[in-house]
Amino acid sequence: MENSHNESEEQPQSTPKVEEEQPAVEQSPENQCSEDDQSSEDLSSEEQSSDEEFFPEELLPELLPEMLLCEDRPPQECLPQKNAFEDRIPMEQPPCGIGKHKLEEGSFKERLARSRPQFRGDIHGRNLSNEEMIRAADELEEMKRVRNKLMIMHWKAKRSRPYPI
């Protein structure tokens, strides 16, 4: 019986707190969000704090433009949706795995055959003396030999295991 009496006392105390919080939010005229967003923010104050921990604005501004536009801060700090991506500096080279060779048509062998003359041009395209050309060709041959040796060693090591990994 005492527990039910304590619970009834706690409920009236908690409801005025909610009523006191709501007028404070309604008094801010700078709020750019709609009234529906305000009511949902009041109801999920705990969820907001957890969202802020996992998704800080500094790390993901382009992914959360709606949040940035709805916040209570001066308009010069808010990022408009249109300019969020335009302000980025374009990359000089695409990241690994994305490049012209991915966009070109044809099979892997065709693309490889097209790229091979580029490597030949490294030696023959330059104005080198005969000695320099011979040295460059020797270096390429040595690289091929070492590569083949490593491939053979890898194949032997892989084949000599009694059980596959």
Curated annotation (Swiss-Prot):
Keyword list, A-Z: Nucleus, Transcription, Transcription regulation
Compositionally biased residues, Basic and acidic residues: 101-124
Keyword Transcription regulation: yes
Single GO cellular component term: nucleus
Record region (Disordered): 1-66, 89-124
Domain of life: Eukaryota
Ranges annotated as spanning the membrane: none
Bias (Acidic residues): 33-60
Cell compartments where the protein resides: Nucleus
Pfam families: BEX
Signal peptide: none
Family in the record: Belongs to the TFS-II family. TFA subfamily.
Known role: May be involved in transcriptional regulation. Modulates various viral and cellular promoters in a promoter context-dependent manner. Does not bind DNA directly.
Protein name: Transcription elongation factor A protein-like 1
Organism in which the protein naturally occurs: Rattus norvegicus
Gene field: Tceal1
